[in-house]
């Protein structure tokens, strides 16, 4: 009986606290209605703004389901399941997901406070009974009271709830074992680079082909020489690329070489003199086959003319024909080239002689080694590991030391003996 009275008192105390909390919440414009104590229903039963087009169908959807213990609604979804990469198909009656309040307390009856507004269509409304008929009214009231105490009063109203964007593009969300969306969306990063490289190479190759097609590699005509002389007089010796634009099929390098080697007014075209050959020999001894440098020191002779004169003289040096009247005797340049050739032959023959000497020295070393080996075999023998030594009489044992009447004891008598008595007494 005492326990019954205590329980009634505890129930009245909880009812008074619950009433004060409801009044305070009403003053703070809490969005939920105050629960009437006479009606054994949940305080969430008046949420009648649910769109009937977004009701959860327990039989149509296939997938994982979770029951809400407080709202008594069985929620199912075909998109969210245990398989993280399961194909997520689009359906017309698919509901949006909204932010939820985290778990308020470790109680098995309420897990989250969910927003009951689904922003799809607000044309038709249908009231859903959120109370299970089998639930105890007292348990529901206690749960409501405990949850209302846990919810902060500054909790944002229903209108400020923002939907969470769970919608992902089909290329990302549709990833499964039978779907190749990931393979389709993953592109090769090097593909643009390869494209640019191929395009640049193709463009460069096409440019080279057009350049080669327009380039003329034949001999210069008299008309081209005349035009080139006029252009050089007009533009000078610097603007070869500009001059080449006037001459179709020619480039600046061709124009410059044609001018300096053939069309220059101060070029000497007569036969080389002995004095010029002497100067050429001196500079060749100094700097070698640098024809451009030699041309700077030989006025009137171009790089091309100096090289041609050198090669022609070398060919005459090895020619078996008789000397013509034009060249009655070998020139100074021919003698110089001949001396160079002889020096080259001598230099090439020196290594051969050196190799012969080395081979002869090796042969001598082999002969000496064979002779030394023969001597060792004669001294030590062929089958003996230890060499056979021959001793002379000087190293023999003197047998006269042990004649008759002599013994080893007689030999030891001559050895002085220490004073044992003095050693014992410490003297």
UniProtKB/Swiss-Prot annotation:
Motif (Nuclear localization signal 2): 361-368
Keywords on record: DNA-binding, Nucleus, Repeat, Transcription, Transcription regulation
Gene Ontology CC terms: nucleus
Keyword Translocase part of the UniProt annotation: no
Tissue localization of expression: Expressed at high levels in the synergid cells of the female gametophyte, and at lower levels in the endosperm of young seeds and the trichomes of young leaves and sepals.
Subcellular compartments: Nucleus
Motif (Nuclear localization signal 1): 195-202
GO MF assignments: DNA-binding transcription factor activity; sequence-specific DNA binding; transcription cis-regulatory region binding
Pfam families for the chain: Myb_DNA-bind_6 (PF13921)
Entry function: Transcription factor that binds to the motif 5'-GTAACNT-3' in the promoter of target genes (e.g. DD11 and DD18) and promotes their expression within synergid cells (e.g. in the filiform apparatus) in ovules. Required for the formation of the filiform apparatus during synergid cell differentiation in the female gametophyte. Involved in pollen tube guidance to the micropyle.
Name of the molecule in the record: Transcription factor MYB98
């Amino acid at each position: 009986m005492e326990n019954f009275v205590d329980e009634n008192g505890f129930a009245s105390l909880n009812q008074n606290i619950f009433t004060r909390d409801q009044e305070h919440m009403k003053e703070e414009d809490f969005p939920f209605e105050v629960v009437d104590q006479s009606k054994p229903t949940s305080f969430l039963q008046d949420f009648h703004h649910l769109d009937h087009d977004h009701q959860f169908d327990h039989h149509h959807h296939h997938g994982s389901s979770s029951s809400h213990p407080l709202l008594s609604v069985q929620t199912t979804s075909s998109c969210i399941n245990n398989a993280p990469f399961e194909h997520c198909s689009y359906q017309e009656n698919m509901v949006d997901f909204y932010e939820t309040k985290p778990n308020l307390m470790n109680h098995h009856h309420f897990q989250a406070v969910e927003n009951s507004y689904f922003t799809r269509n607000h044309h038709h409304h249908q009231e859903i009974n959120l109370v299970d008929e089998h639930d105890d009214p007292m348990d529901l009231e206690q749960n409501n009271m405990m949850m209302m105490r846990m919810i902060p009063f500054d909790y944002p109203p229903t209108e400020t709830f923002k939907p969470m964007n769970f919608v992902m593009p089909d290329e990302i969300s549709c990833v499964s074992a039978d779907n190749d969306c990931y393979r389709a969306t993953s592109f090769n990063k090097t593909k643009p680079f390869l494209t640019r490289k191929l395009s640049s190479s193709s463009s460069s190759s096409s440019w080279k082909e057009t350049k080669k097609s327009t380039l003329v590699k034949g001999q210069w005509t008299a008309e081209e020489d005349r035009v080139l002389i006029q252009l050089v007089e007009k533009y000078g010796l610097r603007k070869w690329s500009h001059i080449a634009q006037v001459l179709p099929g020619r480039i600046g390098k061709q124009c410059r070489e044609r001018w300096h080697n053939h069309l220059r007014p101060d070029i000497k075209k007569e036969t080389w003199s002995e004095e010029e050959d002497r100067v050429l020999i001196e500079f060749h001894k100094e700097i070698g086959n640098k024809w451009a440098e030699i041309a700077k020191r030989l006025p009137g002779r171009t790089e091309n003319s100096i090289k041609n004169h050198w090669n022609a003289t070398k060919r005459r040096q090895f020619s078996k024909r008789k000397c013509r009247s034009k060249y009655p005797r070998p020139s100074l340049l021919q003698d110089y080239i001949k001396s160079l050739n002889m020096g080259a032959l001598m230099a090439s023959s020196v290594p051969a002689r050196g190799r012969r000497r080395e081979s002869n020295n090796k042969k001598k070393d082999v002969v000496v080694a064979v002779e030394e080996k023969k001597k060792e075999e004669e001294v030590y023998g062929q089958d003996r590991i230890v060499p056979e030594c021959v001793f002379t009489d000087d190293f023999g044992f003197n047998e006269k030391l042990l004649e008759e009447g002599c013994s080893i004891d007689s030999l030891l008598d001559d050895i002085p003996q220490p004073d044992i008595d003095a050693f014992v007494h410490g003297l």
